[in-house]
Amino acid sequence: MTRPQAILTDIEGTTSSISFVKDVLFPYARRAMPAYVRDHGNHPQVRHWLNQVADEIGEDVPDEVLITTLQTWIDEDRKHTALKALQGLIWGDGYKTADFTAHIYADAAIQLKAWHAAGIPLYVYSSGSVPAQKLFFAHSDAGDLSGLITDWFDTEVGPKRESASYRRIAERIGVPGPEILFLSDVIEELDAAKRAGMRTALLDRLDDYPTPRSADEVGSHQRVESFSQLVL
C-alpha cells in the first residue's frame, strides 16, 4: 500500500482525550454561557447563532430560554452547529485567559509533526466548529500545533456519520478518497468514510476505551491504540 496523499483526523478520542472535552471544555462552556450571552448577545456573530437556536425551537423566545436550551444541549452532547459555534467562542475566551490548555496525546503530537515534516497534508474533521478546532490546536499541551494543519472541517460540510460528508471533503481538498487516511475513535464515522472510499484507522485508546473494541466491531478498519502504531 502506498503512503496516503492526505491524512484526515478527528479530535475527541483520537488526537485528544474524551475526558478533557467532557470534563473540562463542556462544563466550562455550560458555566460561562449565561454571562457570555448577556454580555455578547448583541454582537452580530453571536446573535446569528442565537437566532439559529430560536429557529430550531420554532419560537420567538427570550435569551434566557435560549441559554437554558443551549445548556441542555451541552448536557446531551448535541451536535448542533450553533451550539458548537457558541462553545467555540466561549472556549476562545478561556484559552486567551489561560484558564486551560487543550489536551493532546504525546504520540499524536509527535506523529502529526513527523507527517507534516514528511510533506503529508493534514486535515481536521470534528463536530466542534472550525474556530474552536483552530483554538484547540493553537493552545495545546504541546504548544501551537495549528500550523501543522492544512485545512479544517466541521459539521457545516455535513454530519460525520454520512458518507456524503467525506466525499465533499475529498472534493474540497482535491485528493481521491482512496488516497486519504481518516482517523477516528468512532466506528460509525469510519464506516461512513470507508463507504466514501477512504482508508480508515480506528483509534482504540485504553484511556478512552478501557475495554477494547471486538474484532467484529472493528471490522475491516485498521485498529491501533496510539498514533505510533499506525501503518501508512
Curated annotation (Swiss-Prot):
Q: Entry cofactor note text?
A: Binds 1 Mg(2+) ion per subunit.
Which branch of life, at top level? Answer: Bacteria
List, in alphabetical order, the Gene Ontology terms for molecular function in this entry.
Answer: 2,3-diketo-5-methylthiopentyl-1-phosphate enolase activity; 2-hydroxy-3-keto-5-methylthiopentenyl-1-phosphate phosphatase activity; acireductone synthase activity; magnesium ion binding
**Which reaction equations make up its catalytic activity?**
5-methylsulfanyl-2,3-dioxopentyl phosphate + H2O = 1,2-dihydroxy-5-(methylsulfanyl)pent-1-en-3-one + phosphate
Instruction: Establish whether keyword Isomerase is in the entry.
Output: no
Among the Pfam families in the record, one is Hydrolase
**Its annotated pathway?**
Amino-acid biosynthesis; L-methionine biosynthesis via salvage pathway; L-methionine from S-methyl-5-thio-alpha-D-ribose 1-phosphate: step 3/6; Amino-acid biosynthesis; L-methionine biosynthesis via salvage pathway; L-methionine from S-methyl-5-thio-alpha-D-ribose 1-phosphate: step 4/6
Record carries keyword Hydrolase = yes
Instruction: State the Gene Ontology BP annotations.
Output: L-methionine salvage from methylthioadenosine
Q: Which cofactor does it need?
A: Mg(2+)
Question: What are the entry keywords?
Answer: Amino-acid biosynthesis, Hydrolase, Magnesium, Metal-binding, Methionine biosynthesis
Q: What is its EC number?
A: 3.1.3.77
Matching NCBIfam families = enolase-ppase, HAD-SF-IA-v1
What functional role does this protein have? Answer: Bifunctional enzyme that catalyzes the enolization of 2,3-diketo-5-methylthiopentyl-1-phosphate (DK-MTP-1-P) into the intermediate 2-hydroxy-3-keto-5-methylthiopentenyl-1-phosphate (HK-MTPenyl-1-P), which is then dephosphorylated to form the acireductone 1,2-dihydroxy-3-keto-5-methylthiopentene (DHK-MTPene).
Q: Which family does it belong to?
A: Belongs to the HAD-like hydrolase superfamily. MasA/MtnC family.
Binding partners and assembly: Monomer.
> What is the protein's given name?
Enolase-phosphatase E1
**To which species is this protein native?**
Xanthomonas axonopodis pv. citri (strain 306)
Lineage, broadest ranks:
Bacteria, Pseudomonadati, Pseudomonadota, Gammaproteobacteria, Lysobacterales
